[in-house]
Structure formats: structure tokens, C-alpha cells
């Protein structure tokens, strides 16, 4: 009789742990997006702050910005508290770097791109979390396509073709739409394969928040270029 009583209890505990993990991961990812938006607004409305990214210092900031995701992911399981702080700092820096978009695109364009990105992200993250179908192959194909896209974008930096760049934006949206779903499923599975301890759960949640934040940011950037095709301030 005790065996029958314990089985439902273990299932309930597993569900509670998973729900707690998902709440932390998506909650921290959402907080990072919010901090980026606030940071972008303050920098965009303050010429003095925006000018801090001009000159040689911008290269230092750019290097730090590229290094942060690797540091956060590498330290998340060992030092989750430090990684959480670094994730939030990274979100603030990202928002500050993107504040210049306010000089290029109209407020309506930025808002449309943001709302569209949020809608696509929520739908695909939900799908990736609840679907029983394995998205590992989709994720691998999307990652390969992303590498090819990066190479093509570097080549187009020399060609400077606006049309090619515009087409790449649609490709980028497709890639990060797929990655959002596959990453959501992969991170859920990563938690389920862990020991479920508090430290492991928090560390994986931070890694997931960083990964999904990057998916959202890239989705936003590509949609911004699409919607901004005829709605820039130029």
C-alpha cells in the first residue's frame, strides 16, 4: 500500500519542481528583457549617456558584451548568484547598446517589432515546453542554418546589399523562431535530467534565461529590420 501512496507523491513533487524551474527561468528571462527596455529608454533620452558609447570605449564595451554570455553560462552551476547578477548587468548593457535604434527607427516601428517578437517568443516557448515531439533535429538544423547565415552576413558586409540584408532578416526570424522552441524543450529536458537540487535548478534556470534572452533579442533585431524597411527616420 505504501508503494502506491509514494508513487503519486513523487510525481507531484517532480511537477512542483519543474514548475518552479520554469517559473524561475522564464521569470528571469522576462526580467532581463524588462531591464534592457528600461536601459534603452534612459540612454535614448539622455545624449550624455549615449555619448559614453562613442570613441575607443565602445570597443571595450563590445568585447565585454560578447564575453558575458560565456561567463554567465560557464559559472551558472558553480556560482549561481554571481551569474544571476552578471545576467542582469548584461541585459542593462544590451539595452544601452541598442538605445541608438531610437535614432534610426520610429517609436511605432520599435513597438511593433517588440510586440511581434514577444508574441512569437511566447507561442514558440510554450510549444517547445509542452510538445511531446522531439525538437532536437529542428534545433540542430536551425543552429547549422544560423552559422551559415552569420557567414553570409559577414560576406554581405563587403557587398553592402540592402536587399540581401533584408532577405537575411526573414531567414533570421525563421531560425530564431525554431531555436526558441527547441531551446525551451532542451532546457526543460536538461532540468529533468539533473538531480533537481536547488543549486542545479537555479544554475540551469540562469543558463536557460540567458539562452532564451539571446533568442528573443535576435528575434527582435531581425523583426526590427523587417518592419523598419520603410519606417526608419532616415
Question: What residues fall within each predicted segment?
Answer:
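A hydrophobic alpha-helical transmembrane-helix feature that marks the membrane cores
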Residues: 1-234
